[in-house]
């Protein structure tokens, strides 16, 4: 056994005792969790930290209460080491309401706002972009904090790893990336998954200074972590610490462990960090007779108390099932601070830009980031001139890494900033769907209400510009399917101008879909000093005979169709959804109650569409108001083609809306 004190700082006896106590505390907690799992007290997946305790103990000893921690699904030890009380962690393992996430997260999703513990993350590599965003928020606010991000060797194969380290190095952010390299990603050996098995070289290639340390030696880990934390606190940018470690137990309780040799496991157990430190302390006269037994007794008592309290704690009542999906927005939304007092003649592009300028001028927490939004001025020129006006810290060009910078936006929102993330086009958002759906939409719920995500994501959507199948789809209904997200689709100049301010006042993640065919459209912007209500649909044209229901880029076509129908003696009411999630069902049902017929115009595909959802709502809630079948006008079910005539044929056009309206009125077969 190597001497753990060689090449390391001299530590006091009290300090070494504390390191030993912390490792023992984590080990005993995890062992008890295994027992409780076999008794079916803990369910789901259980990933224990047994064998790896030296990593968390050594690194986290150097963190302060203001520093942030982002972890993995094997995070029980990190949570305990980050000052979350054991009783709250154990209650969460049980799924009880007294747990640190109110029982909503369970073993893989421990959170605590007071401890600045931003969660276990069950998506491999999913926490790395969040850590980047937390550090970015601190840097923008001038706070001297560090974010420690723990992950395994498997995460180093994920795109999020490369995107996150690149962003952190590019922006010189105070992130300590801690790779707990236990040689296996679930059951896949490092050598089978990585052509380059020296993980420090991956970090160095991305511009992050890196070091590798024996992760079974708590003193060595602490010393390496302290060196890196010193550099971080000095403003020297991110650091990468690889800790070579080993888990003594299976990946999870369902793992038969057929992929590693028993002799290998036993060889690593010979390097167990707990006896390694304890035996060295005994030989050095630093661990006195009876002291370890006393530590074990204290830990056992704490553990028994935590289990007893978890057993006695209440389950969250079913009546609260729908809690923690959204944070309640303010009942009174502050009006836009820079609302115009006179009408303006302008384009939708200019209206969107006015909204951005207002947000940046009147809320110092707001910043904009995305691809080509600064020097280039935005793919659709919405942000042109903003870099010169607000500077590169707040108009932040990003690499082509949608998942990375969107996740960083989510992390920045967790860190008290108000980010506006621009994704160039909806098709590119699919590269960020992991972070949008698995993080932005779920963090409030998984944390039991501990962490909201006040984030705005803007993106272009829709077809009509002859840019074919990878830049042209209308996929907003996919996001409207997801609880935890709010989805907006402006179709008027007033909404283009004022929706952003309202979205920034909302404490939830808000996605704004800007139809590409609106950017060049011009009109008169009437002043709206009270702002817009992003909870409600809007009646854009009253009528008594037929409800035309639409949103976004289809609104101008629908209004044109309504005008043509009026010439035929049909008074159509035009309902602009504006808000795709949560839908304003009351306005929809009320409109149908007046007109008794409905045509839904939706640029998405018909199968699984928003139009289908609205039709179902009307059938469920207003069936007896219907005098005719509901009609849907949607895009033909093909990828958007390039040729102009085929693209036009695929998309809903005024003639299609008119034909559907006439069928609903019984005037056309």
Predicted features along the sequence, with ranges:
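Conserved acidic/glycine
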Residues: 1-55, 243, 248-249, 253-390, ...
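Cofactor-binding active-site loop characterized by glycine-rich and histidine/acidic residues
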Residues: 31-35, 39-171, 192-195, 200, ...
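Glycine/charged-rich beta-loop-alpha catalytic/anionic-binding loops adjacent to active sites
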Residues: 36-42, 107-121, 144-150, 183-184, ...
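Thiamine diphosphate
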Residues: 57, 115-308, 312, 374-450, ...
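Acidic, glycine-rich active-site loops and adjacent beta-strand->loop/helix elements
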Residues: 73-78, 114, 151-157, 179-185, ...
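Phosphate/diphosphate-binding glycine-rich loops and adjacent basic-rich segments that engage nucleotide
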Residues: 466-549
């Amino acid at each position: 056994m190597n001497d753990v004190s060689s090449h390391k700082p001299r530590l006091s006896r009290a300090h070494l005792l504390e390191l030993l106590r912390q490792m023992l505390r984590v080990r005993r907690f995890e062992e008890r969790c295994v027992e409780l799992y076999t008794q079916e007290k803990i369910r789901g997946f259980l990933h224990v930290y047994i064998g790896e305790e030296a990593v968390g103990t050594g690194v986290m000893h150097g963190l302060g209460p203001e520093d942030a921690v982002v972890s993995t699904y094997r995070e029980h030890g990190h949570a305990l080491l980050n000052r979350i009380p054991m009783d709250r962690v154990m209650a969460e393992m049980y799924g009880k309401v007294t747990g640190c996430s109110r029982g909503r997260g369970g073993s893989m999703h421990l959170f605590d706002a007071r401890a600045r513990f931003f969660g276990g993350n069950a998506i491999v590599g999913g926490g790395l972009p969040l850590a980047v965003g937390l550090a970015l928020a601190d840097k923008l606010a001038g706070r001297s904090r560090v974010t420690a991000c723990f992950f395994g060797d498997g995460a180093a194969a994920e795109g999020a790893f490369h995107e996150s380290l690149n962003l952190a190095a590019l922006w010189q952010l105070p992130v300590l990336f801690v790779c707990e390299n236990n040689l296996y990603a679930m059951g896949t050996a490092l050598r089978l998954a990585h052509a380059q098995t020296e993980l420090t070289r991956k970090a160095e290639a991305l511009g992050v200074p890196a070091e590798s340390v024996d992760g079974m030696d708590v003193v060595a880990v602490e010393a390496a972590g302290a060196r890196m934390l010193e550099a971080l606190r000095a403003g020297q940018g991110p650091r990468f610490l690889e800790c070579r470690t080993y888990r003594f137990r299976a990946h999870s309780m369902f793992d038969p462990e057929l992929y590693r040799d028993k002799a290998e496991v036993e060889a690593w157990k010979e390097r167990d960090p707990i006896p390694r430190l304890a035996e060295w302390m005994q030989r050095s006269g630093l661990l006195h007779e009876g002291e370890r037994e006393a530590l074990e007794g204290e830990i056992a008592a704490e553990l028994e108390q935590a289990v007893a309290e978890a057993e006695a704690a209440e389950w969250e009542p079913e009546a609260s099932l729908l809690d923690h999906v959204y944070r309640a927005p303010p009942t009174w939304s502050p009006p836009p601070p820079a609302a115009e007092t006179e009408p303006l003649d302008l384009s939708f592009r200019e209206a969107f830009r006015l909204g951005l300028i207002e947000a940046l001028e009147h809320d110092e927490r707001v910043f904009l980031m995305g691809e080509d939004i600064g020097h280039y001025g935005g793919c659709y020129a919405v942000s042109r001139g903003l870099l010169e006006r607000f500077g590169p810290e707040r108009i932040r060009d990003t690499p082509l890494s949608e998942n990375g910078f969107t996740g960083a936006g989510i992390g920045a929102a967790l860190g008290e900033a108000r980010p506006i993330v621009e994704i160039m086009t909806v098709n590119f958002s699919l590269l960020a769907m992991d972070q949008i759906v698995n993080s932005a939409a779920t963090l409030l719920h998984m944390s039991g209400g501990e962490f909201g995500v006040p984030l705005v994501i803007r993106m272009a959507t829709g077809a009509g510009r002859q840019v074919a199948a990878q830049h042209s789809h209308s996929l907003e209904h996919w996001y409207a399917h997801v609880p935890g997200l709010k989805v907006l689709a402006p179709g008027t100049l007033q909404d283009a101008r004022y929706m952003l301010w309202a979205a920034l006042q909302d404490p939830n993640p808000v996605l704004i879909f800007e139809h590409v065919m609106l950017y060049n459209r011009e009109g008169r912007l009437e002043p709206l000093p009270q702002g817009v209500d992003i909870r409600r649909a809007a009646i854009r044209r009253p009528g008594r005979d037929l409800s035309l229901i639409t949103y976004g880029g289809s609104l101008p076509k629908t209004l044109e169709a309504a005008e043509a129908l009026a010439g035929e003696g049909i008074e159509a009411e035009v309902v602009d959804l504006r808000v795709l999630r949560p839908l304003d069902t009351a306005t929809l049902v009320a409109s149908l109650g007046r007109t008794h017929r409905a045509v839904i115009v939706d640029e998405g595909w018909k199968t699984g569409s928003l139009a289908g959802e609205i039709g179902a709502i009307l059938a469920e809630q207003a069936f007896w108001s219907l005098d005719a079948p509901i009609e849907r006008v949607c895009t033909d079910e093909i990828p958007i083609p390039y040729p102009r005539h085929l693209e036009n044929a695929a998309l809903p056009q005024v003639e299609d809306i008119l034909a559907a309206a006439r069928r609903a009125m019984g005037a056309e077969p």
